[in-house]
A protein has these predicted regions:
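C-terminal segment of classical bacterial N-terminal signal peptides
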Residues: 15-25
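Bacterial N-terminal signal peptides that target proteins for export
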Residues: 1-9
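Surface-exposed repetitive/solenoidal architectures
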Residues: 26-221
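Terminal non-domain segments
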Residues: 7, 25-26
Length: 221
């Protein structure tokens, strides 16, 4: 009887631990789905040198422009004017379909905080006959020659990589970060605060008879 009770306790304990390590997100859909971001914000700010973000929908519009149209914001400053709660939907790492999207301007958090953000990866390649796969996860996919300053991600933010990738031959490029997954060129992070978690299962399963080169990197700024 004691042995049965002990086993039951152990099963319950392991179940609780599993929930703590790999909790399930409640969000449905992406911030980049039509209707979830403010298209008018893009039209109003297209020619502005300083682009002000005050709502989650405006924040999503900024990301959607990078993700869908490779709008890289060169010579522009994107500035928060309020705390932003991003808990309504998931944030797909903005890299666009060709993985050519990156941010090259100034992102000024102005001391404000992003909360409730759940980042999920963008993926490219990795089919049965494909010898290359790229997985990128972060608020920014890639920053290039950019400046990110006075930005806080609070403890309710998270980067989730819930999938195990089966990859048996070639090159796997895996970049996971919080504020940014990848930085290129002269990039500066100034007075940024990160309290976000990176939550992941084992991410790679390989075969026995093939060769793999795996690159894993990322920025927790």
């Amino acid at each position: 009887m004691k042995r049965i009770a002990y086993r039951f306790f152990l099963i319950v304990l392991l179940s609780v631990l599993a929930v703590e390590v790999f909790p399930v997100s409640a969000q449905e859909g992406s911030w980049f789905d039509e209707g979830n971001y403010d298209e008018e914000w893009l039209d109003k700010n297209f020619d502005n040198d300083v682009m002000i973000i005050s709502t989650p929908e405006e924040f999503a519009a900024w990301g959607a422009a990078m993700n869908r149209w490779s709008w890289n914001y060169p010579d522009k400053t994107v500035r928060l004017a309020a705390d932003i709660d991003m808990s309504a939907h998931k944030w797909i790492t903005p890299v666009n379909e060709q993985f050519g999207g990156y941010f090259s301007g100034v992102f000024d958090g102005d001391g404000y905080t992003i909360s409730g953000l759940t980042v999920v990866p963008a993926e490219e390649g990795g089919g049965y006959d494909d010898d290359y796969k790229r997985v990128v996860a972060g608020l920014f996919g890639t920053v290039r020659g950019a400046e990110i300053r006075d930005l806080t991600l609070d403890e309710t933010c998270r980067v989730e990589v819930p999938e195990m990738y089966s990859f048996y031959y070639g090159n796997l490029d895996l970049k996971i970060g919080t504020i940014a997954a990848s930085a290129e060129g002269d990039v500066r992070f100034i007075r940024c605060v990160n309290r976000a978690d990176i939550v992941t299962t084992p991410v790679l399963r390989t075969g026995d008879s093939h060769e793999i080169v795996c690159s894993v990197s990322g920025l927790v700024a």
